[in-house]
Amino acid sequence: MNIKIIGVGKVKEKYFKAGIAEYAKRMERYAKFEIVEVPDEKAPETLSQAEMDAVMAKEGERILAKIKDREYVYALAIKGKERSSEEFAKEINQLATYGHSDITFVIGGSLGLSPAVLKRANTQISFGRFTLPHKLMRLVLAEQIYRAFTIINGLPYHK
């Protein structure tokens, strides 16, 4: 199985990088894990709706360029469906059972994801109504993916 997280912007903080690297290492026995960073669009603090739409569209084009047709895509979105860790693990296991060996998760920038990315996504997932920095979300997502694999394999990590 191939797992990819596409995120807008670069993670610079060593502590986030270290956490993500730890879960990437733990996942090696279950899947090939990859983080893809696409550049964020520079924008001033105050934007009109049209300017926000343009920023999201440009970031969306960069994201879509990194997604292959065969990939099953999860978009992380506030309006996405919330799942428990157990439900998420069951879903990942079912995807593998039905032949989806390439699973991609997309985390947008500060303005969110473009309509084009949301349309391309096979499903939208939410980690709740909290607003989290997208860099932190990469770490949280990596941990949840690892947790899903431990649940699938009956390991004691998930309690």
Curated annotation (Swiss-Prot):
InterPro entries: Alpha/beta_knot_MTases (IPR029028), RlmH-like (IPR003742), tRNA_m1G_MTases_N (IPR029026). Its EC number is 2.1.1.177. One of its GO terms (cellular component) is cytoplasm. The keyword Transferase applies. GO terms for molecular function: rRNA (pseudouridine-N3-)-methyltransferase activity. S-adenosyl-L-methionine binds at L76, G108. It is found in: Cytoplasm. NCBIfam families: PRK00103.1-3, tRNA_RlmH_YbeA. Specifically methylates the pseudouridine at position 1915 (m3Psi1915) in 23S rRNA. This is Ribosomal RNA large subunit methyltransferase H.
